[in-house]
Amino acid sequence: MVQRWLYSTNAKDIAVLYFMLAIFSGMAGTAMSLIIRLELAAPGSQYLHGNSQLFNVLVVGHAVLMIFFLVMPALIGGFGNQKRYESNNNNNQVMENKEYNLKLNYDKLGPYLAGLIEGDGTITVQNSSSMKKSKYRPLIVVVFKLEDLELANYLCNLTKCGKVYKKINRNYVLWTIHDLKGVYTLLNIINGYMRTPKYEAFVRGAEFMNNYINSTTITHNKLKNMDNIKIKPLDTSDIGSNAWLAGMTDADGNFSINLMNGKNRSSRAMPYYCLELRQNYQKNSNNNNINFSYFYIMSAIATYFNVNLYSRERNLNLLVSTNNTYKTYYSYKVMVANTYKNIKVMEYFNKYSLLSSKHLDFLDWSKLVILINNEGQSMKTNGSWELGMNLRKDYNKTRTTFTWSHLKNTYLENK
């Protein structure tokens, strides 16, 4: 019972202890106040027999108890985190983490979340050699388009980790996991399913958690339900063996429809799948800039779909003061445009569904792929060209129709 309360890391348990201290201190302070009032109310009858020192002790003790052991623990201890949270997030809307009775399918959730985090997520871990006085815990943040708020809430509810922040006047939302339990849970879920150089950040996060758990006897007792994370190697299994590519595509992939009106050849509607990632993952370590290449994972994806891997170079104008400063970005790109190879893309994403709003684009995209595969390119009524034109009216960036029925009973949940 003693260990239950003294070693608890639950915020509600800690708040209850603060309230208990405040109540006990309030009772003691009230008793002192009563003695002081009796002493002052009867000048001719000295209850303390003229002991001025004892009277002064009671006055000072009453003030200390009521201010530092009643008011501060009750208000700051019991409500401090809530007040600070509200004041620091005036520009954010925090979405409720509703409690759903969902069971996780780790074999599918792990790869999907790994792909999602390796695409649009970050795992931030302070360097152990940092000279900063303030040490902070690992932080996991996943960025979603504003249209994918439903997915962010779904994953937050499913894993019971973190909170979803909707930024005011921004076109994105953030799923942020900062508490120890949440970070520990998510690192365990994606352990063994990472495929890109971001694995390096995962390892640092897992090592931080292991070192923190074993740092002191008190910490170890507090976190006795948390075992050390047994760090697994990079996942080198076949791309089609799990949902990793679905998570990565929800982050950085897209399904496009091009309408090609050529002069020397007939007009065509061209559906294609594209995934583009930067070429290198950079990490500053002891003033040494270490590069890790994305070539191997992108080559594996290209091989899976039997297409070529392309290298792309782009110059971005940084607009520094009045001078045009350019920064060159290098990326690898996988593009599947062949009709028969698009069928394999369909087979994969029918098995491991996308969960973002891109799922709706994929369904429309699939209609065009199936029509072209069955009937070929056609400018006729109800042909591929007409279908492509109609689909593009509510598609990708122009989409205004969103449904989320595909988030009910997903393959990420046990069945």
Swiss-Prot record:
Cofactors demanded by this protein: Mg(2+)
Entry's Gene Ontology BP terms: aerobic respiration; intron homing; mRNA processing; respiratory electron transport chain; RNA splicing
One Pfam family it belongs to: LAGLIDADG_1
UniProt-recorded Gene Ontology molecular function terms: cytochrome-c oxidase activity; endonuclease activity; heme binding
InterPro entries: Cyt_c_oxase-like_su1_dom (IPR023616), Cyt_c_oxase-like_su1_sf (IPR036927), Cyt_C_Oxase_1 (IPR000883), Homing_endonucl (IPR027434), LAGLIDADG_dom (IPR004860), LAGLIDADG_Endonuclease (IPR051289)
Cellular localisation: Mitochondrion; Membrane
Enzyme Commission number, as recorded: 3.1.-.-
PANTHER family from the UniProt entry: INTRON-ENCODED ENDONUCLEASE AI3-RELATED, INTRON-ENCODED LAGLIDADG ENDONUCLEASE FAMILY PROTEIN
Family: In the C-terminal section; belongs to the LAGLIDADG endonuclease family.
Descriptive protein name: Intron-encoded DNA endonuclease aI3
Naturally occurring in which organism (per UniProt): Saccharomyces cerevisiae (strain ATCC 204508 / S288c) (Baker's yeast)
Name of the gene: AI3
